[in-house]
Amino acid sequence: MPHHVSKARFAELVERAAATLPAQFASALAEVPIEIRDRPSTRMLRSLGLEDDELLLGLYHGRPRTERSVEDSGRLPDVIYIFQEDVELVSESEQDLIEQVRTTVLHELGHHFGMSEEDLDELGYG
């Protein structure tokens, strides 16, 4: 059964997860804000080849550090989206929710650093 919390509590869990990140990830949060949304938009899902009923826990929107160049100046800033309802759906308890939020934040920050899905799976952030 999904574990639901208030928007304020979920935001607190995201902040706590960000505060406990390994040093190499924590420094990136100054560059990449985290935005909490209830669910991904249809446009976001379609851009990933997903249907409306598929879950998406988080999304990194931007250009990974490994692909940047001087030509990138003036582009929109990177952002990480965390989708509260989908994270809650895969969490059966408060502890599950805490762990899933942290894993999702780490996963999306990994994309910021240029890591692939396979790289993240190997690190346990898949």
What are the roles of these predicted feature ranges?
Residues 1-100, 112, 116-121:
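Active-site rim/adjacent substrate-binding subdomains
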Residues 100-108:
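Short alpha-helical catalytic segment bearing the HExxH-like zincin motif
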Residues 122-126:
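Short hydrophobic/aromatic patches at helix-to-coil boundaries
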